[in-house]
A protein has these predicted regions:
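Hydrophobic alpha-helical transmembrane segments
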Residues: 1-71, 75, 82-165
Length: 165
């Protein structure tokens, strides 16, 4: 019998089909890249629904996986990065075939999300203190929100020429 928690439904969701286990170096970055690929092909309403569904499933799956493997916030759990990165793209990434902008905003959203996810400034670091799957997911949700807001600010200043002073 295989006792690997990856081969359970929770494990497959938490590790995004095992991707987090396959990619040994920087699995979180792999999760963010996977989310960027999804963002290019999913219209925004579908992305919003995916965020809600994956966040709810992610809390359950990440918590169950964490408990099964006996480690706190295991690195191979990357469903949180997928959700956080998708949040960072909302309002920015155009869908292929619906006008330009996909690459223009996906790359900065990716870089900003990875920045907030790795450095974990407040409130990101406070969110990861929540217990179990909630803490695993919540810090990346906060990182995604901060990345999204930062990208909006950068767009306003550098692209739209808006300056509040």
């Amino acid at each position: 019998m295989n006792n690997d928690p990856v081969v359970t439904p929770a494990g497959l969701i938490a590790t995004v089909g095992g991707l987090g286990k396959i990619v040994k170096k920087a699995p979180g970055t792999a999760g963010s890249v996977a989310a960027c690929v999804l963002a290019v092909f999913l219209p925004e309403p579908v992305r919003l629904a995916a965020i809600a569904a994956l966040a709810a499933l992610g809390v359950w799956a990440a918590g169950a996986y964490e408990k099964a493997c006996g480690r706190s916030d295991p690195g191979e759990v990357i469903i949180d990065e997928v959700v956080g990165q998708l949040i960072a793209t909302i309002g920015h990434a155009a869908v292929v075939g619906q006008g330009g902008g996909a690459v223009n905003f996906l790359i900065p959203s990716f870089l900003l999300f990875r920045f907030f996810d790795i450095l974990k400034p407040w409130p990101v670091n406070a969110c990861e203190k929540a217990p179990g799957g909630l803490g695993i997911m919540l810090d990346d949700v906060a990182g995604g929100v901060l990345a999204n807001l930062a990208l909006w600010g950068l767009r306003k200043v550098f692209i739209e020429g808006w300056w509040p002073f």
